[in-house]
Every structure is written in C-alpha cells, then in structure tokens.
C-alpha cells in the first residue's frame, strides 16, 4: 500500500487509530500498524529532571513552531535506519500544507539542532518522529511540546510505540481499547496547534516549576 494513499485517507486512518510506516527509506511499500500497547505522553506533564532544568537554565536555546517543517522531517529521516520513505515524505508535506502536520524546532542561534513533528486531528497530537544533533535537544523538544499542547487545548499525545527514552519523560503504554476510547474523546475537541506562541526558555522553566 502506498500508491493509492492520499493525505485525506491518511487522516481518516489516524482517526481510526492506525498509522503507516515503511520498512526502510528505499522501500516503496507502506504498511499499517495498530500496536496492542500504545505509547502516550502526558499533555502538559512530562517529567523534567533536575539536571535537565539546570541545563535549560543555562542554555541559550530557543524553540519555534512550523518554522522549518521540511528541515525537521529531513532531520528525522537522516539516520542509518528509518521508516520514513519517499511516499511518506510527500504525504507529510501535503498534510503540512493542509494544516494537519506541524513541527517544533530547537535552535542554538540560527542552527537547527533538534526537533519533532507530528499530525493533529481535533485534540489529538500524533507524534511521528524527533531528532537531535546535540545532547538534550530531543528532551528540550519534548518539554516545549508538552507545554504547547496543553496551552493549545490538546488532550491526547500519541507516541505510537513506548520506549525507555519516552518512559523517562513520563511516557507509558496503554492497551489498544483504552487508546481508542481516549482517541475518540480527543477527536471531539477543537484544539488549535497555532493558537499560542511558544514561551522562551525562562518562561518555560517558570511554567515547569508551577506545575511540578
């Protein structure tokens, strides 16, 4: 499955809880997945360690939204093994133009050092992938994204598969049926990913302190 997949069909599939992946960057075929255990992160409540708070307090990084979607997707695909193939790259660009795909960039000065991207439907954010060119950049992206999703009214943060890195930030796995219930509820919520600007790092730290 790949040739007949459109951005509209892809959104309809996500609304049912399934998502596509390729076996490799060079593979033409896409396959549908619906894990028995689905990874999620707490909107507005990711765990931020003391060491990460200290790191952010003394760094000069900043975060932006939808500033370089193509660059973030390229960064996520730039690894030895990736499930992002050419058909998916084209679909993500279509979804970005439609307003259903978004990126968060982490920058040191003007350099893109990390980020993540995902899809939105109602109050659900489907995180697709993230990358890091410096230590802690992917953690910073998760922290900023957590704050942003909460500010914009999202209630579900889907990470597809659980993993130890996400678990260290508060991620957990839930059964498929529970995920479907949460997804159905989130789809009824009119969240807007572009409703708020991102805070600077000092405002982000203050927000973390108030909610922890």
Curated annotation (Swiss-Prot):
EC annotation from Swiss-Prot or TrEMBL: 2.3.2.6
Record-linked Pfam families: Leu_Phe_trans
Compartment(s): Cytoplasm
Reaction catalysed by this enzyme: N-terminal L-lysyl-[protein] + L-leucyl-tRNA(Leu) = N-terminal L-leucyl-L-lysyl-[protein] + tRNA(Leu) + H(+); N-terminal L-arginyl-[protein] + L-leucyl-tRNA(Leu) = N-terminal L-leucyl-L-arginyl-[protein] + tRNA(Leu) + H(+); L-phenylalanyl-tRNA(Phe) + an N-terminal L-alpha-aminoacyl-[protein] = an N-terminal L-phenylalanyl-L-alpha-aminoacyl-[protein] + tRNA(Phe)
Protein keywords: Acyltransferase, Cytoplasm, Transferase
GO function term, MF aspect, one: leucyl-tRNA--protein transferase activity
Family: Belongs to the L/F-transferase family.
HAMAP family xrefs: Leu_Phe_trans
Protein name: Leucyl/phenylalanyl-tRNA--protein transferase
Species per Swiss-Prot/TrEMBL record: Paracoccus denitrificans (strain Pd 1222)
Lineage: Bacteria, Pseudomonadati, Pseudomonadota, Alphaproteobacteria, Rhodobacterales
């Amino acid at each position: 499955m790949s040739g007949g997949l459109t951005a509209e069909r892809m959104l309809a599939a996500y609304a049912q809880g399934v998502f596509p992946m390729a076996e490799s960057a060079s593979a033409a075929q896409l396959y549908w997945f619906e894990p028995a255990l689905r990874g999620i992160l707490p909107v507005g409540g990711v765990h931020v360690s003391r060491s990460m708070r200290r790191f952010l307090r003394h760094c000069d990084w900043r975060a932006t939204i939808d500033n370089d979607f193509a660059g973030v997707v390229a960064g996520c695909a730039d690894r030895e093994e990736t499930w992002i193939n050419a058909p998916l790259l084209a679909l993500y660009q279509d979804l970005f133009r439609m307003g259903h795909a978004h990126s968060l960039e982490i920058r040191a000065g003007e350099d893109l050092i990390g980020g993540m991207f995902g899809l939105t439907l109602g109050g659900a954010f489907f995180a697709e992938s993230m990358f890091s060119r410096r230590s802690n950049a992917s953690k910073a992206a998760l922290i900023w994204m957590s704050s942003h999703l909460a500010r914009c009214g999202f209630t579900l943060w889907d990470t597809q598969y659980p993993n130890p890195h996400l678990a260290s930030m508060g991620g957990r796995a839930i059964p498929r049926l529970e995920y479907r219930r949460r997804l159905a509820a989130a789809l009824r919520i009119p969240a807007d990913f572009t409703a708020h600007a991102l805070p600077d790092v000092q405002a982000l730290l203050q927000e973390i302190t108030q909610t922890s």
